[in-house]
Amino acid sequence: KEIKAFRLNDSNRISPLTQAEKKTYQLPDSLDKISWFRVTKYLSEIFYGGYLLAGPVDIGPLDNLYSFNGIEGSRFRLSGKTNYRLSRRIYADFMLAYGTKDKKMKYDLGLKYSFNSLTKNPYSFPANFIGVQYTYNTFIPGRTIENSNYDRLSLSLTDIVDYRLAFNKSIFLEWLYETKKGITINPYLKFQEVKAYGDWTFSDRDSVEVSSFRKDRIGINIRLLFNGTWIQNQNKRITVGGNFTSMNINYEYGFDNTHLIKANAYRKVNLMPFGYIQLWAEGGYMVGRIMSPYLFTSSTYNSIIYHPNAFNLMKVMEFFTDKYIQLIAVYNLNGLIFNRIPYVRELKLREEFNIKMVYGGLRDENKFLIDNLDVKTFESKPYIEAGFGFRNLFQVLGVEYIRRITYSEGLPELKKWGIRATLGFRF
């Protein structure tokens, strides 16, 4: 079909292509015939996409193939998804995981039907698909379950292991529609049963401890992207370029008469020649008597790997709230200082400063939910951590020093600060 489309396009040209223009079309084909180029291209796709490309199936994410924690022990996971080589309409994804300590199998299976047959990915612009996902897997209570993804090898490289897990058994139905003006509409319906995993329980709305409960709800996500430019590969989309803004709004109604609204925004501002600033702002509010696994807790990344829009020194499940506001600011000087230091300028390092803060609370009617979780809510001050470091060492490496500014009382000195590494190209 692609060859016929090209011939039709070529035959309908007003003027024929010159020899130089024809060679431009032939260049990609000639490069693909060079063995070292094919190998480099294949390895680059694995590095950036995180998947092992195996014909009609992509195996990955590779960072999730193995992880370990104190509850499951060594967790082995095989997951992947089909790609356009199998079908440009129907896409499937799967996951199987097994823990050597708990000796339990976890799994999920998803199907997506794309209304756009010209793309190589259901999320390719402009996305338009319906999907269904069945999940039987563990998650960390308090995190957004759809994005918890705690079983990454990089997250296993930490000395912070005191978190709890729960089982999520759910059916998720969605429709995602994206306009050419950068607006994405994503209504969904979820039927879910949550079960505590291990020697702990939840508190229900009557302050009674229970080991499991149901949470069915309907919701909608709306995403807005302004002045955005992105790179689309087979597995993900990376927003690049200069000044752009993205916003997400999520509303959810629980069939137990609860409401959730959450919004976040990202803004990148170029200050050339003084570098650029990245800003993440986020807030959420819940109405009704919420079960403890659905309270808000900040995104953490307890690893030797630095994450720009998560808290690197906050413990998992350290703070629980039913309302919160969060701000993260990163200022990259783009070599403004290092480029003026002899010899150091040859390394082309990029200085970076960051500050992260979050503040929230629990209404009196929900405070009992955390009594048996050994967690806390905020006092009269926000949680703050800040750091500085450099990027672009050998084009891909970076080092970050982070300091915990508040809520550090009683912590050993080594828990108040940390050094983290980064790996990857910056756009």
Task: Map each language-model feature to its residues.
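Exposed, low-structure sequence patches enriched in small/polar residues
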Residues: E2-F427
